[in-house]
Regions:
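Single conserved hydrophobic/aromatic residue that forms the stacking wall/gate
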Residues: 1-7, 12, 301-304
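Propeptide (latency) domains of metzincin metalloproteases
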Residues: 4-9, 16, 20-25, 35, ...
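Glycine-rich, charged/polar anion/phosphate-binding loops
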Residues: 14-18, 277-278
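An acidic-aromatic substrate-binding cleft motif
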Residues: 27-38, 45-92, 101
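Conserved hydrophobic/aromatic pocket- or pore-lining residues that grip, position, or stack substrates
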Residues: 68, 98, 136
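Active-site-adjacent substrate/metal-binding segments within catalytic domains
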Residues: 86-90, 95-97, 105-114
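Aromatic- and carboxylate-enriched substrate-binding clefts and catalytic-loop regions
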Residues: 110-280
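Glycine-rich, aromatic-lined ligand/substrate-binding cores of catalytic
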Residues: 272-303
Length: 304
């Protein structure tokens, strides 16, 4: 596959082959999992077991945990004496919340960098990232940065080195949205370079897991799911309740899932409606709590 940049989008042109390889080589396993009981399917680790072993050596620095997430409710915190939004005051509020409640991380989702420039070194003027990182360190909270795929890919060595030295703990990389040879190669390179600088990776907007989290244990999560964020814009014909009780037996067989469960606004299907500012789940609040137990995830989101 060849690519060319049109605006900020990758334009793909198909080739009459799946992948280009040189000489003899082995190829990844293809798996058919059979279990005696359906309850064994979500805890089947065949994909992980057949992946290439750890390539990064010691990984005691990798710390799974919970993460406070501001994008779910559009930075919509209330009862504060400052204007909530993409600014230091809002993120310090999230850091304080995380510190009080034993939440290990706060994520700075889309908006902290100048997105239209696709440049992770152009930070919006309302954010002083060095100050935030220092403040979070005092509170024993780690920061994770969202990054669009294109901005991360074009200078990932420099990006990883710079933000690791600042004290950032990892990246949530988004909008890959395909699984051709070029994109699979990107995932491997991103995992390898991030590990070099002791950064964790959450692959959002990605293809299904294939065991990369064994080869590079710093890959702690994958989206690749019709997750809760879809409720921000889905219509009433979406049956998320049925999907949620089916997904563990299908998608979770491949690996951990960045579902972002935990909605505290809840509705039955008849009352559900989409909302970017005050999103809701379909189903009950107890159902959302149960998903923390059922859905395997090394980075559990919470939205104060």
């Amino acid at each position: 596959i060849t690519t060319r940049l049109v605006g900020s989008e990758m334009c793909i042109r198909d080739r009459p082959y799946i992948a280009r390889v040189a000489g003899k080589r082995t190829f990844p396993w293809r798996i058919m999992a059979v279990t005696a009981e359906d309850t064994q399917m979500p805890v089947n680790h065949l994909v992980y077991a057949l992946a290439a072993p750890n390539r990064i050596g010691d990984y005691n620095w990798i710390k799974p945990g919970k993460v406070a997430w501001e994008w779910w409710n559009h930075w919509g915190i209330k009862g504060v004496d400052f204007e909530a939004g993409i600014n230091n005051e809002t993120y310090m509020h999230y850091i304080d919340f995380a510190s009080r409640h034993g939440i290990e991380y706060v994520i700075l989702d889309e908006g902290w960098a100048v997105n239209l420039k696709a440049d992770l070194f152009q930070i919006v003027p309302e954010i002083d990232l060095k100050k935030l990182t220092a403040y979070a360190r005092q509170k024993n909270v780690g920061l994770i940065l969202w990054a669009g795929y294109h901005a991360f890919a074009r200078d990932m060595e420099h990006v990883c080195k710079h933000y690791s030295e600042m004290g950032i703990k990892g990246f949530k990389i988004d909008f890959m949205d395909r699984d051709d040879q070029e994109m699979v190669d990107f995932h491997y390179r991103a995992a390898e370079i991030a590990a070099k600088y002791k950064l964790m990776v959450d692959f959002h907007g990605t293809y299904k897991p294939t065991g990369l989290n064994r080869t590079y244990p710093n890959v702690i999560n994958y989206e690749a799911v019709h997750g809760l964020e879809q409720m921000k814009w889905s219509d009433i014909h979406t049956d998320q309740v049925t999907y949620d009780v089916t997904m563990p037996f299908i998608r979770m067989l491949a690996g951990p899932v960045d579902y972002t469960q935990g909605a505290m606004h809840n509705a039955n299907k008849r009352c559900y409606h989409s909302s970017m500012d005050t999103p809701m789940s379909q189903g009950t609040r107890c159902r959302q709590l149960a998903e923390y137990v059922v859905f395997e995830s090394c980075l559990l989101y919470t939205s104060p």
